[in-house]
Structures are given as structure tokens and as C-alpha cells.
């Protein structure tokens, strides 16, 4: 298995202006993750996370303006599947969906879209993914991971 995220990953946070997006986005930024944009419909044009991250109304717009290639999703369960689909159609290569409680029927639709667009999905209902000292996408504390000869995967 290859490394899925690194310091070159260009990250868009879907749901960046919500409380989870703000808190964990700040943690990821502090870790050194290359967050290039955020998406919250209706809030495009503002900057967040200490005025360092531009917010767009759609993932398509964020990709067009920032060349984002990786997305992390912090949206409520009823909107999570649509957020994954939006990211896939916008050309995002890797989507990490933290949201828990996404309806199974919604994920069936997501699976077909991901396959068609060659998008990888980690989640939903996962803590995220980390490449030590390079990129952290998710809710796990960065200090618990140290560089070494072992990789760990939790299924």
C-alpha cells in the first residue's frame, strides 16, 4: 500500500466553518498539514483559521482556485454522502469522511460515484489518516504518532 497523504497534499476542508471543522482544522494546520481551502455553502469569500484559509461555496470552485486534491469532511450525517459525491465530481483524489451515522443507503450511492470518478474514500466514521511529520487529516492528536519502521491501520 502506498502513502496516501504527504506534505504535498493540498487539502480542502468541507464544513470548515462549523465547530468541528474549526477545531480540527486548526489542529491540522498546527501539525503542518497543507490546508489550501475550505468549503461551506453560502460562506464563500471569507477567510478562516486565523485568516489563513479561504472559504469557497463549492468544492469545484475550491479545486479550480487552489488545485486541492484531498478533502476532509466535517458535516452532519444527512449531508455527508452528498459532500463525498461533490468532492468526487470536483476531481478530488482522496476523501476522508470523519462523520459518523451516515445512512447505509446513502453510502451505496457514494460507492458508485467513487468508482466512476476513481476517487478513494477513507471512512465514514473514522479518525482519519496521518503521515508522521507531514500531513494529518482527522481527529486524532498528532503527538501520539512517531516516525518509525511500523505502519498501523485501524479497520
Report the location of each language-model feature:
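Glycine-rich, highly charged phosphate/nucleotide-binding loops
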Residues: 50-65, 72-81
